[in-house]
């Protein structure tokens, strides 16, 4: 029975401009789809923009537009970038298409009918200032796993799936106030009830044998931890309405509706869509995703399909990639670091060069750092000195010394015996979505061709052994034709150009690999690529390095903003370290209902009675340390003058009724979306250069204040000094 390849790339959020790392999945799926088509397999490559949910609604608020207008804008931006990269989607749609709402609601109604939906009264964060329930991504705070800034559904840094209540020091993303928990009703999909069927499906040898090792490990680990009911509704306006009485003001959570978008996008364009999505016998479903999307494709979406009790096409091949990072920096438009899709277009570097480099370094098993110098070196050596050089030198030699016409070839069997087996290896690598390995094997063949040319010295032997050299060149010409086919999934425009040299209509079929006929003439030859110059690379690196902002970043106030987290805590209990009586062990309330303690050498400065019940300020993101065997989870801050007088900053000097857990910020950072800095050592804190000036804590002349009450932080006892 004929096999069909149904290929998807993870639907990108439509609230931003894709950067180089975001392009890995759509490019990977594009290469596989091109391979599939030239192998004679009926193929459908689907992608589209993921347009509903909190991220879109939030971005629309920031840009002061409607969610739909925002989606329209970014859809066109995404589409133009993908077009420039020569990504040949069969369908590039949107989840705001006319079929999406109906398709999502039908899935829900079937799940409800089959007993997989539960109604729960839950506590959800509510913002008293904005008077709204906060969806998961409207809540930000510190990830309990890695201490990075995270949103309430998932940590982007460590990929841990979260609930908003898991976050440390949660805040409303809109107003930055601390939300309260309030009762609300939501609908949940009963994943535990589907678990047995899901595990049976995953353990089936035909299911997961073609999944990445990392994807399988992550999925099995998630199953071992036990599936939990997961909410599928949210208190939002921008989303798919819930077709259930009492839920008229709620929408489906984006994780529930987005993967169904693969189906609805197909349905919107293809009349016989069921032949693709309800055809397990013939269709091979191949999905390309980033590692942060693994569980949504191996657990969540399969559970939705299983729970509907319909014969949906199920996942066969899963190709998950790691992260592509940028020069040890974070991609950030605002900071000018990293290169984004629209930037790539303006570099003057052809799209095939970018495609080549991304495939050459595709992060299949580990993260990869994009480095400008490496781009130049890989492109100049592998793409140009190896591949492009072979094409140019062989075709130019033929045209110059033997003419345009290609005679009947005398097959050099030893030559092809070394090459033909490699074709099968490369095609198998393509089939198994090992794209980086496939490309590197192709380049080995190109390198072999260059070696054969060099070793035979045709420029010397064309007179003494003309027939032998002519046969060598003709065999190399057919090798180049084959290389143009194998390279087509990676550098399609260049492959077409090579075949234009032969004057033929394009011949991109794996069936003609190794054949020695079909080329009649060399019409013309020209250089495929120009080498990347060091000056150009240096200029581009500088342009996208964010170095123009480095001086600003090094200012103490910016170091404080990015690296230091100060928080108000209340001293609930004080103990002495039995091993060192000068060390006070302070038991603290930081507003999270979790015990926290710090160790400080306070003997001779304070008694326990003077400090008990007081509110002080600690460096809350200091790396934990041990003092005489006792763990310390932060450091209190104090002021010291030139005479070495030392006094702790007591918050009661600044405000009558301090609140434990409140953050200390710069006065000019009011109402800003502040990040939660990572763990730091004491040196990072020292570089912030906090001082007391006329009784007020300042950095570079800017006052430190309480985030919510806005009161200035005062130092009554040490009006002028340093903070340590």
Curated annotation (Swiss-Prot):
Residues 560-665 form the tRNA-binding domain. It catalyses: tRNA(Met) + L-methionine + ATP = L-methionyl-tRNA(Met) + AMP + diphosphate. The keyword 4Fe-4S does not apply. Gene3D superfamilies: HUPs, Isoleucyl-tRNA Synthetase, Domain 1, Methionyl-tRNA synthetase, Zn-domain, Nucleic acid-binding proteins. GO terms for cellular component: aminoacyl-tRNA synthetase multienzyme complex; cytosol. Transmembrane segments: none annotated. A motif ('HIGH' region) lies at residues 12-22. Keywords: Aminoacyl-tRNA synthetase, ATP-binding, Cytoplasm, Ligase, Metal-binding, Nucleotide-binding, Protein biosynthesis, RNA-binding, tRNA-binding, Zinc. The keyword Ligase applies. InterPro entries: aa-tRNA-synth_I_CS, Anticodon_Met, Met-tRNA-synth_bsu_C, Met-tRNA_ligase_1, Met-tRNA_synth, Methionyl/Leucyl_tRNA_Synth, MetRS_core, MetRS_Zn. It holds the Pfam family tRNA-synt_1g. Zn(2+) binds at residues 143, 146, 155, 158. One of its GO terms (molecular function) is metal ion binding. Its cofactor is Zn(2+). ATP binds at residue 333. It is found in: Cytoplasm. Belongs to the class-I aminoacyl-tRNA synthetase family. MetG type 1 subfamily. Is required not only for elongation of protein synthesis but also for the initiation of all mRNA translation through initiator tRNA(fMet) aminoacylation. This is Methionine--tRNA ligase. It comes from Borreliella afzelii (strain PKo). The gene is metG.
């Amino acid at each position: 029975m004929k096999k069909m390849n149904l290929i998807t790339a993870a639907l990108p959020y439509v609230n931003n401009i894709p950067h180089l790392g975001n392009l890995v999945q759509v490019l990977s799926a594009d290469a596989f789809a091109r391979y599939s088509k030239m192998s004679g397999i009926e193929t459908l490559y689907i992608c589209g923009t993921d347009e509903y949910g909190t991220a879109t609604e939030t971005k629309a608020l920031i840009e002061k537009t409607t969610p739909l207008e925002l989606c329209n804008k970014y859809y066109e931006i995404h589409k133009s970038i993908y077009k420039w990269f020569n990504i040949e989607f069969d369908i590039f749609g949107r989840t705001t298409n006319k079929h999406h709402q109906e398709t999502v609601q039908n899935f829900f109604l079937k799940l409800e009918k089959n007993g997989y939906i539960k109604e729960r009264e839950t506590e959800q964060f509510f913002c008293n200032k904005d008077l709204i329930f906060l969806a998961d991504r409207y809540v930000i705070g510190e990830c309990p796993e890695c201490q990075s800034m995270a949103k309430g559904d998932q940590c982007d840094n460590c990929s841990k799936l979260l609930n908003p209540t898991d976050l440390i020091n949660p805040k409303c993303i809109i107003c930055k106030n601390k939300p309260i928990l309030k009762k609300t009703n939501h609908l949940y999909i009963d994943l535990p009830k589907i678990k047995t069927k899901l595990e049976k499906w995953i353990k089936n040898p035909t299911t997961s044998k073609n999944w990445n090792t990392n994807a399988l490990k992550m999925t099995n680990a998630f199953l071992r931890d036990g599936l939990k009911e997961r909410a599928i509704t949210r208190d939002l306006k921008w989303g798919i309405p819930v077709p259930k009485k009492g839920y008229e003001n709620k929408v489906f959570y984006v994780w529930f509706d987005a993967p169904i978008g693969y189906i609805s996008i197909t349905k919107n364009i293809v009349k016989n869509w069921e032949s693709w999505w309800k055809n397990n016998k013939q269709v091979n479903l191949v999905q390309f995703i980033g590692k942060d999307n693994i569980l949504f494709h191996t657990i969540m979406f399969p559970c939705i399909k299983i729970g509907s009790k319909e014969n949906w096409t199920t996942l066969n091949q899963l190709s998950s990639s790691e992260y592509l990072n940028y020069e040890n920096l974070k991609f950030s438009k605002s900071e000018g670091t990293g290169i984004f899709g629209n930037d790539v277009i303006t570099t003057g570097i052809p799209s095939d060069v970018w495609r080549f480099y991304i495939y050459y370094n595709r992060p299949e098993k580990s993260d990869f750092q994009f480095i400008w110098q490496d781009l130049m070196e890989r492109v100049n050596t592998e793409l140009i000195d190896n591949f492009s050089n072979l094409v140019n030198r062989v075709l130019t030699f033929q045209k110059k010394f033997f003419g345009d016409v290609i005679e009947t070839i005398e097959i050099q069997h030893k030559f092809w015996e070394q090459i033909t087996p490699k074709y099968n290896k490369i095609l198998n690598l393509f089939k198994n979505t090992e794209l980086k390995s496939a490309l590197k094997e192709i380049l080995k063949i190109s390198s072999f061709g260059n070696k054969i040319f060099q070793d035979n010295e045709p420029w010397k032997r064309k007179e003494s052994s003309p027939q032998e050299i002519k046969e060598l060149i003709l065999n190399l010409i057919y090798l180049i034709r084959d290389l143009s086919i194998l390279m087509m999934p990676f550098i399609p425009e260049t492959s077409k150009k090579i075949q234009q040299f032969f004057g033929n209509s394009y011949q991109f079929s794996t069936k003609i690999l190794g054949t020695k006929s079909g080329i009649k003439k060399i019409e013309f030859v020209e250089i495929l690529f120009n080498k990347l110059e060091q000056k150009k690379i240096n200029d581009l690196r500088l342009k996208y390095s964010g170095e123009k902002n480095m001086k600003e970043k090094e200012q103490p106030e910016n170091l404080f903003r990015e690296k230091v987290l100060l928080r108000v805590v209340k001293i609930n209990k004080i103990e002495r370290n039995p091993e060192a009586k000068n060390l006070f062990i302070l038991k603290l309330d930081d507003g999270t209902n979790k015990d926290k303690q710090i160790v400080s050498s306070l003997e001779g400065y304070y008694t326990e009675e003077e400090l008990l019940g007081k509110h002080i300020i600690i460096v809350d993101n200091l790396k934990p340390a041990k003092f005489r065997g006792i763990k310390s989870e932060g450091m209190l801050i104090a002021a010291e003058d030139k005479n070495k007088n030392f006094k702790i900053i007591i918050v009661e000097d600044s405000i009558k009724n301090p609140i434990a857990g409140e953050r200390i910020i710069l006065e000019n950072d009011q109402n800003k979306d502040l990040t939660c800095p990572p763990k730091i050592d004491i040196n990072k804190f020292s570089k912030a250069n906090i001082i007391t000036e006329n009784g007020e804590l300042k950095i570079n002349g800017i006052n430190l204040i309480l985030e919510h009450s806005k009161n200035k932080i005062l130092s009554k006892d040490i009006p002028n000094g340093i903070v340590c």
